[in-house]
C-alpha cells in the first residue's frame, strides 16, 4: 500500500487531534520517587509534565508549519488543505476541515501563542497533570474553531474550549476565581445556544439538509430570515469578541487568571469572535450584513471610547489591560463594517496584532505580580531600577499597544481609519464622526498606558516592594517569551505585507461579495434598508 503524498497528508486533522490525544497520555507519565506531600515532589512531577506538554506543543507547531509550506497558497481564495470524511450522512454531517486566508493566519497565531503560553506556565506546580491536560485540550479546540468547515462541528469545537478555560480559571485563578469562572461559563455557554439554534436553522432550511459551511453559504435565505440569523450570531460572537455591553465577563476573567491563561484569553479566545463574524455573518449572510454594518461601526466606536475611559479609571493592573483589550477590539468591528478592502484587511491585522501584543502584556503583568504580589497600582512604584529588563519589556509592549509607528498596532489601526474615511458606503458626516471618535480613543490609549508605566516603575518608591528579596529581574525564559512576541510585532509594523499577503485575497473576496450585493440595489448602506423594504 503506497503512502499518501505530502499534499494528501491530513495536516489539519493531525494538528487538531494530536495535542488532544497526547493530553490523554499525561496521566501515564511516571511519577518521581519520594513523598507526594512534599514541595520537592510536586516540583519534580511538574517538571516532567511541563516538558512533555512543551514537546507536544512545539511538534504540533512544526507539523502545522510543514503543512503550511507544503499545501497552502496565499494567492488562492478557495479552501486549502481540505479534508472531508463522512460522519453522519443522514443529516449531512461530516468531519470537514480546511484553511483559507481568514483562518490560516489565526491558526498559525494559535499554535505560536499557545506554545509560548505553555512555556509561560513553567512556575505552575499545583495539579500539573490536570493543568497541562487542559492546556493541550484547549490548544486542539481553538485550532479546531478556525479550521472546521462544518457548522455543527464548529459548535462542538466552540464548546470544547469552554470547559478547559472554566477549569483553568476556577482551579488556578485568584481569590474570586469561582465567581469569574462561573460568570465566564454563563456568558459563553448561554451565548453558544444562539450558534446552535441559528446553525440548525440554516442547515435544515431548504435543500439539501447540510451542515457544510460551503453549502450553507450558497443557500438562498429570505432577507428576514438572514436578519434573524445575523442577530443570533452577533450576540454569540459579540460575547466572545467582546462587544459592549456583553463584555463584563472579560475583566473578571482576566482579573483572576494566571499568566498562561491570560495569554490564551487575550491572544486567541477574543479572536474567535472576530473570525466568526467574518466567516459567517459576512460570508454567509451578506444581505443582512448591509443592514448591520452601521450597527457594527457604532458598537466599535462605543467599544473604543467606553473601554478606554474605563481602563483609565481602573486601579487594578489586570483589569486595566483587560479594558484596553476591549477597546482595541472596537477597531475590528469598524473594519468589518467599513465595506472596504483596506478596512477589512485592517480588522484582520488588528486581530493578529492584538493577539501578539495582548499576550505579551498579560504575560508581563503575571511576571510583575509574581514579584510584587500585588495588582493595585497604588501599592506599586519605584521598581524600575530593581527590574530593568521587565521595565524595558513592559515599556516596549505598552508602546506597541498604543500603536507606536513601526509596530503592528499602528499599521492595523491606520488601515481601519483609512478604510472608514474612504468608504463610499456611508455619508460623509457619518464617516467624519466615526473617524473623530475613534481618534479620541486612540488619544486616550497612551494616557492610561503611560500613566500605568509611571505608577508601576516610577513614582514614590514603595520600600516594602523595592527591598523585598523576591523582587528580581526577568529570567532568560521570560526574556525569550517576550522576544518571540516582540519580533513579529516589530516585523509586521515595518513590513505588514509579511502577514497581509496571507489573507488579502480572502478579505478582498468578502468585500467583493458585499459590493456586489450593494451595487445590486444601487444605494449606500444607509439607504439599503429602505430599498429592501420597498421590495
Swiss-Prot record:
GO BP annotation list: ATP synthesis coupled electron transport; electron transport coupled proton transport
Pfam assignment, any one: Proton_antipo_M
Main location (coarse class): membrane
Topology of this chain in the membrane: Multi-pass membrane protein
Membrane-spanning intervals of the chain: 9-29, 51-71, 106-126, 130-150, 152-172, 184-204, 227-247, 258-278, 290-310, 326-346, 347-367, 399-419, 432-452, 479-499
Catalytic activity: a plastoquinone + NADH + (n+1) H(+)(in) = a plastoquinol + NAD(+) + n H(+)(out); a plastoquinone + NADPH + (n+1) H(+)(in) = a plastoquinol + NADP(+) + n H(+)(out)
GO cellular component, one term: plasma membrane-derived thylakoid membrane
The keyword Ribonucleoprotein is assigned to this record: no
A GO molecular-function annotation: NADH dehydrogenase (ubiquinone) activity
Keywords for the protein's UniProt record, in alphabetical order: Membrane, NAD, NADP, Plastoquinone, Quinone, Thylakoid, Translocase, Transmembrane, Transmembrane helix
Source organism, top-level taxon: Bacteria
Matching HAMAP family: NDH1_NuoM
Family membership: Belongs to the complex I subunit 4 family.
NCBIfam families, alphabetized: NDH_I_M, PRK02546.1, PRK12561.1
Biological function: NDH-1 shuttles electrons from NAD(P)H, via FMN and iron-sulfur (Fe-S) centers, to quinones in the respiratory chain. The immediate electron acceptor for the enzyme in this species is believed to be plastoquinone. Couples the redox reaction to proton translocation (for every two electrons transferred, four hydrogen ions are translocated across the cytoplasmic membrane), and thus conserves the redox energy in a proton gradient.
Protein name: NAD(P)H-quinone oxidoreductase chain 4 2
Species whose genome carries this gene: Synechococcus sp. (strain JA-3-3Ab)
Amino acid at each position: 500500500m503506497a503512502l499518501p503524498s505530502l499534499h494528501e497528508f491530513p495536516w489539519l486533522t493531525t494538528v487538531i487531534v494530536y495535542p488532544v490525544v497526547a493530553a490523554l497520555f499525561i496521566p501515564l507519565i511516571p511519577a518521581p520517587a519520594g513523598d507526594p506531600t512534599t514541595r520537592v515532589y510536586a516540583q519534580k512531577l511538574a517538571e516532567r509534565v511541563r516538558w512533555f506538554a512543551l514537546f507536544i506543543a512545539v511538534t504540533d507547531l512544526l507539523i502545522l508549519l510543514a503543512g503550511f509550506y507544503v499545501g497552502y497558497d496565499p494567492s488562492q481564495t478557495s479552501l486549502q488543505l481540505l479534508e472531508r470524511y463522512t460522519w453522519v450522512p443522514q443529516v449531512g454531517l461530516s468531519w470537514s476541515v480546511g484553511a483559507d486566508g481568514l483562518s490560516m493566519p489565526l491558526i498559525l497565531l494559535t499554535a505560536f501563542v499557545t506554545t509560548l503560553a505553555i512555556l509561560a506556565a513553567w512556575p505552575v506546580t499545583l495539579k500539573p497533570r490536570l493543568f497541562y491536560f487542559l492546556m493541550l485540550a484547549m490548544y486542539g479546540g481553538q485550532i479546531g474553531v478556525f479550521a472546521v468547515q462544518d457548522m455543527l462541528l464548529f459548535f462542538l469545537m466552540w464548546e470544547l474550549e469552554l470547559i478547559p478555560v472554566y477549569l483553568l480559571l476556577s482551579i488556578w485563578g485568584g481569590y474570586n476565581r469561582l465567581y469569574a469562572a462561573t460568570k465566564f461559563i454563563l456568558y459563553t455557554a448561554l451565548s453558544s445556544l444562539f450558534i446552535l439554534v441559528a446553525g440548525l436553522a440554516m442547515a435544515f432550511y431548504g435543500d439539501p439538509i447540510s451542515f457544510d459551511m460551503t453549502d450553507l453559504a450558497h443557500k438562498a435565505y429570505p432577507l428576514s430570515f438572514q436578519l434573524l440569523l445575523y442577530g443570533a450570531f452577533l450576540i454569540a460572537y459579540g460575547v466572545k469578541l467582546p462587544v459592549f455591553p456583553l463584555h463584563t465577563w472579560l475583566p473578571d476573567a482576566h482579573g483572576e487568571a494566571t499568566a498562561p491563561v491570560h495569554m490564551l484569553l487575550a491572544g486567541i479566545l477574543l479572536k474567535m469572535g472576530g473570525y466568526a463574524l467574518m466567516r459567517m455573518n459576512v460570508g454567509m449572510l451578506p444581505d443582512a450584513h448591509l443592514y448591520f454594518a452601521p450597527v457594527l461601526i457604532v458598537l466599535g466606536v462605543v467599544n473604543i471610547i467606553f473601554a478606554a475611559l474605563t481602563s483609565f479609571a481602573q486601579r487594578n493592573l489586570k483589569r486595566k489591560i483587560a479594558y484596553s483589550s476591549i477597546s482595541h477590539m472596537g477597531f475590528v468591528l469598524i473594519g468589518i463594517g467599513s465595506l472596504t478592502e483596506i478596512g477589512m484587511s485592517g480588522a484582520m491585522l488588528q486581530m493578529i496584532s492584538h493577539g501578539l501584543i495582548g499576550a505579551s502584556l498579560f504575560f508581563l503583568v503575571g511576571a510583575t505580580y509574581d514579584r510584587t504580589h500585588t495588582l493595585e497600582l497604588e501599592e506599586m512604584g519605584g521598581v524600575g531600577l530593581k527590574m530593568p529588563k521587565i521595565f524595558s519589556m513592559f515599556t516596549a509592549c505598552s508602546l506597541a499597544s498604543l500603536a507606536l509607528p513601526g509596530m503592528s498596532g499602528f499599521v492595523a489601526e491606520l488601515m481601519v481609519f483609512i478604510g472608514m474615511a474612504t468608504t463610499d458606503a456611508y455619508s460623509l458626516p457619518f464617516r467624519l464622526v466615526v473617524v473623530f471618535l475613534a481618534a479620541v480613543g486612540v488619544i486616550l490609549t497612551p494616557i492610561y498606558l503611560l500613566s500605568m508605566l509611571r505608577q508601576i516603575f516610577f513614582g514614590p518608591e514603595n520600600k516594602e516592594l523595592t527591598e523585598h528579596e523576591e523582587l528580581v529581574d526577568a529570567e532568560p525564559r521570560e526574556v525569550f517569551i517576550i522576544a518571540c512576541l516582540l519580533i513579529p510585532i516589530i516585523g509586521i509594523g515595518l513590513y505588514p505585507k509579511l502577514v497581509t499577503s496571507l489573507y488579502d485575497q480572502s478579505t478582498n473576496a468578502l468585500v467583493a461579495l458585499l459590493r456586489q450585493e450593494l451595487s445590486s440595489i444601487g444605494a449606500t448602506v444607509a439607504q439599503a434598508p429602505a430599498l429592501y423594504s420597498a421590495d
